[in-house]
Amino acid sequence: MYHLPDTLYEQEKMPRRAKRLFVDTFSQHHKLNAGDEEAAMQKARQALEERYVRVNDLQWIPRRAAYEIIRDDMSSDSDGPAASPPGDHARPNRDKRRVSYSSSDSSARSSDDQLISARGSDDQLISTRSSDDHLVGAGKARRPARKKKRIGKVVASQKFVGGGAQYSTDDDEDDY
């Protein structure tokens, strides 16, 4: 049963995980003596192509690694070769991004602090934070923890203290 999937990747360089994924998917969809080898082979190939990318016609690498390689190549192309030495171009860019995020984050915090001291309204603070979130990006620092209300528990001020509902017995209000 394992000799059928072996025929596909005999000449290809596949990582061990990719081979295992292919064989497991093939054996899951292949029934003995059912004649569905082609369908099982196609499903195994699709499962392999979802997680791995073929490079140089014979080598397979994980899809995430391929995206990282492409992203690094694109960032190095946009910097230009004259801007930095060939080996040191990735690290300064990351540092610059971190600095810009932290400075924009601190400016957003200072504007929020000014808003609190000037107006003192929590509703306006929430609206400015939500509008500034798209500017700050993924590099922002964590906000201070807030006390959360527990679901299902009733705060003492919200409890019904009286013995029953109190209705007005005035006949003035019910004149029809």
Swiss-Prot record:
In this chain, composition skew of type Basic residues spans 140-152
Q: Which InterPro entries match?
A: ChaB, ChaB_sf
Region feature Disordered, mapped onto this chain: 71-176
Q: Where are the transmembrane segments?
A: none
A Pfam family assignment: ChaB
Q: Give the Low complexity compositional bias ranges.
A: 77-87, 100-109
- Please give the name of this protein: Uncharacterized 19.9 kDa protein
Originating species? Orgyia pseudotsugata multicapsid polyhedrosis virus (OpMNPV)
